[in-house]
From Swiss-Prot:
Pathway: Cofactor biosynthesis; ubiquinone biosynthesis. This is NAD(P)H oxidoreductase RTN4IP1, mitochondrial. One of its GO terms (molecular function) is oxidoreductase activity. Belongs to the zinc-containing alcohol dehydrogenase family. Quinone oxidoreductase subfamily. Gene3D superfamilies: Medium-chain alcohol dehydrogenases, catalytic domain (3.90.180.10), NAD(P)-binding Rossmann-like Domain (3.40.50.720). One of its GO terms (cellular component) is mitochondrion. NADPH binds at residues 214, 216-217, 237, 255, 276, 300, 341, 343, 386-388. Residues 1-40 form a transit peptide. Widely expressed in mitochondria-enriched tissues. Found in heart, kidney, liver, brain and spinal cord. Keywords: Membrane, Mitochondrion, Mitochondrion outer membrane, NADP, Neurogenesis, Nucleotide-binding, Oxidoreductase, Transit peptide, Ubiquinone biosynthesis. NAD(P)H oxidoreductase involved in the ubiquinone biosynthetic pathway. Required for the O-methyltransferase activity of COQ3. Able to catalyze the oxidoreduction of 3-demethylubiquinone into 3-demethylubiquinol in vitro. However, it is unclear if 3-demethylubiquinone constitutes a substrate in vivo. May also play a role in the regulation of retinal ganglion cell (RGC) neurite outgrowth, and hence in the development of the inner retina and optic nerve. Appears to be a potent inhibitor of regeneration following spinal cord injury.
Amino acid sequence: MGVLKTCVLRRSACAAACFWRRTVIPKPPFRGISTTSARSTVMPAWVIDKYGKNEVLRFTQNMMLPIIHYPNEVIIKVHAASVNPIDVNMRSGYGATALNMKRDPLHMKTKGEEFPLTLGRDVSGVVMECGLDVKYFQPGDEVWAAVPPWKQGTLSEFVVVSGNEVSHKPKSLTHTQAASLPYVALTAWSAINKVGGLSDKNCKGKRALILGASGGVGTFAIQVMKAWGAHVTAVCSKDASELVRKLGADEVIDYTLGSVEEQLKSLKLFDFILDNVGGSTETWALNFLKKWSGATYVTLVTPFLLNMDRLGVADGMLQTGVTVGTKALKHLWQGVHYRWAFFMASGPYLDEIAELVDAGKIRPVIERTFPFSEVPEAFLKVERGHARGKTVVNVV
């Protein structure tokens, strides 16, 4: 009981921290949830019962309806969701050690208790039910959100999320368009703003390099940095060059023409580098930062989850700490900053992003949409890589 009380207080505190977001909405006298049946306790969803290849995806009509456990939670009827690379990786078991620890920090559950597991991180839909402490939303509100990977996902009829992870959907977007943005937008926002320290107040005139510019994170990063006045160089393949130029990239490097490192030598140095590629890129990318000027390299490709899968929680966290600390110190001595960034679920950040969207400064980039019946095909599309925007699933 003490643990439950502590969790409730913590979540309530998180919700209270966002009090400045909007005008508080008076609570309606009655809140009811609409489902496919007045007596229904189950819903349709795509789930996995074990980790593996695409064959583990299973459609069910009998997934339990989500319920509100904490007073700051809301239930959303999903109109559209999307598939991200993290979903494909999670389907295969990537990050299971760390995510299970987050789901069950006291190790009270037995192995495999996370199943059946629903994947999908993005949601655009309509609020159906609100917890008692939710003051910024009411049933009927159109909202969007990105669900943390340790929670049940959005490839289902309904999903429950914390109120501080939800934002009102941009008025200018349909649900299909809105579902393409939250996860990649918050990931890019984390890297550029929270870790990289850039914003509309200090970004003007800065030179930015985006490695892996044609995917979901890259296409958002181009647009937000251009909205803030930066000069953006994008690295992608030839067939994505037109796309990234239309999004605002000032210069485009085609990695199919040869060594990116060699091509970059003819350009001026950069103030900021966002790496969506990883691998060997960080062995040379930091050489293209301005030395001793606060220039920063931020990578979204880190060994954190892999270390915990391979070494266990304690050793994995120790190895991760040693790795990032060593690299950061090494590059600091060379006059540049080396950082890791991760997705951060945040309704207030989505509020800011929604303002940029409705102002016409950010537009969704959707490569393909799938009906709810073709979720496995959507996973295969994402798994093949070489994305030119997002893959969206229409649930309604």
